[in-house]
């Protein structure tokens, strides 16, 4: 059914919650007297039965083992019945008075005994606590302490004061199992107790050894050395037993220092059963009082003084303020906490009134059941309308903007052959330049300047497809920045065998030496507003995978104008409003880190540009394509210029 406990098992299996330590040791020692020895299944069934028995009102100290045996169900698994039978045999039996004889005639009654002669004293056959016995009755053999043994012993006595019954029972059981020497006992004392307790124990042990040596001990030879030395001899088993008994007796002189709260602070709760409160007091006194100290007077006093008011009234009314503990438990056995009974008060239904409701003017219902909303007491303080409350005023409700119709794409990288300018909706009044010449059939058609629209919700971030020739094309989100001279791509887009060169970059955060690399392989970039890819002969590679920037080297090949449509409620970037024309000068201040190469001569504040109308300049048409380039002319601010407006940025 389970594993048989050997001598190397834990000194004491853990007791069930709510059972005093000395009571659990009685069950433990009775189980050790079984032949063959108990198993783990037997201890499990014993603890399960004790948990059920502790819930009954028969928890009176000392425990009546005969009553516990009567509570055991028939056919209960395990060997719990044998353990209780051993305890019943060793328990002190109180002689009961003989039953009175049946009534009969006075002539036939036998003469009564002399009432002045008291009955003879019957000495108990067994003490309340069973003597410690080694499991299976095997003789103990000396075994040195192991760390797990010391930890198990310390865990058992962690809530008991040195010298208390639980402490002494645990130490006695450990001494019987391990048969320690004088050195082992000294190590155990230093591991379990504080330095003050060890010093007091050492003084008391020296006095007891001096008395024993003077009195004379069987087998003790004064010429062979002190008792501590002779007790370490394996051949002197008797002297070792004497030294162990003296070592245990030295704990009797130690002052009790309970680790639990003080006994005066253990109070009965308002809804706590009285027997549970007395059990807490009993366990606290067992753990704190030194062995041999009378416990009953203290327990009776605290059982009345620390009880709640309801139990104190019951005990005072029945005259059990300082009675035996059993009378106090029986007096409060029928008391239970007063639970608040919830009573549902049902209001009787009244007939509907015959008078009309003052709110709606109809009869047949009360005003509290009227479905018509209550009229406001006066006009609305916001709009002076007397028909609604202030909380329903339309001025407090935000106006819901009408959904905007979806815009058609404004950018087609195709030649435009229309003679008139093309209007750009909600583009700030800007118009695309018209075509200057007619398209001939045998010539390539001239194209107008393409418009690059940006989404107002996500500007200036666009999606682009990058092909590095060494890996598969990948789609990324890149920053469209007109202030960056070169395009920056993360190193994750390139394969490990891509040749890279070291370069120094001067950006907004200063000059960097190892943040960016330079690639010499061509890179293809496909933008959403361009049908043909952009070919870059070289670009910067971000080794930290922080930036993906489309710079001026790529935007110059688009030959377009950045067009930002103005929404009804333009989005806000940080504390400023996003401008209609995007440039580096309109962005927030860059962070103090190396991010992208910056040409400080290429970007200037907007107020340094001329406020005069844009000038059209035709310069160096691209050979073979016939595409006209438009650019803006920059010059320093003149004294007569006062306008600081900016036009579209032409690349």
UniProtKB/Swiss-Prot annotation:
* Listed EC numbers: 3.4.23.-
Is Metal-binding one of the keywords UniProt gives this record? yes
Short sequence motif PTAP/PSAP motif: positions: 124-127
Summarizing the annotation, the consequence of altering residue 2 to A is: Complete loss of myristoylation the polyprotein. The concomitent loss of binding to the host cell membrane impairs the formation of viral particles
Known InterPro entries for this protein? Aspartic_peptidase_AS, D_retro_matrix, Gag_p24_C, Peptidase_A2_cat, Peptidase_aspartic_dom_sf, Primate_lentivir_Gag_pol-like, Retropepsins, Retrov_capsid_C
GO terms, molecular function: aspartic-type endopeptidase activity; nucleic acid binding; structural molecule activity; zinc ion binding
Q: Does the keyword Metal-binding apply?
A: yes
Q: Region entry Disordered: which residue ranges?
A: 93-144
Task: State what protein this is by name.
Answer: Gag-Pro polyprotein
Q: What PROSITE patterns does this protein's entry cite?
A: ASP_PROT_RETROV (PS50175), ASP_PROTEASE (PS00141), ZF_CCHC (PS50158)
Residues carrying lipid (N-myristoyl glycine): 2
Motif PPXY motif located where?
Answer: 118-121
Peptidase A2 domain residues: 476-554
One biological process term from GO is: viral translational frameshifting
User: Its gene?
Assistant: gag-pro
Outcome (variant: residue 486 to V): Decrease in protease activity
Q: Where is the active site?
A: 481
Give the modified residues of type Phosphoserine. 105
Q: What is the effect of changing residue 486 to I?
A: Almost no effect on protease activity
Can you name the source organism?
Answer: Human T-cell leukemia virus 1 (strain Japan ATK-1 subtype A) (HTLV-1)
Which parts of the sequence are marked as the site Cleavage?
A: 130-131, 344-345, 449-450, 574-575, 582-583
CCHC-type zinc finger segments? 355-372, 378-395
Q: What else is known?
A: HTLV-1 lineages are divided in four clades, A (Cosmopolitan), B (Central African group), C (Melanesian group) and D (New Central African group).
Question: Which keywords appear in this protein's UniProt record, sorted alphabetically?
Answer: Aspartyl protease, Capsid protein, Eukaryotic host gene expression shutoff by virus, Eukaryotic host translation shutoff by virus, Host gene expression shutoff by virus, Host-virus interaction, Hydrolase, Lipoprotein, Metal-binding, Myristate, Phosphoprotein, Protease, Repeat, Viral nucleoprotein, Virion, Zinc, Zinc-finger
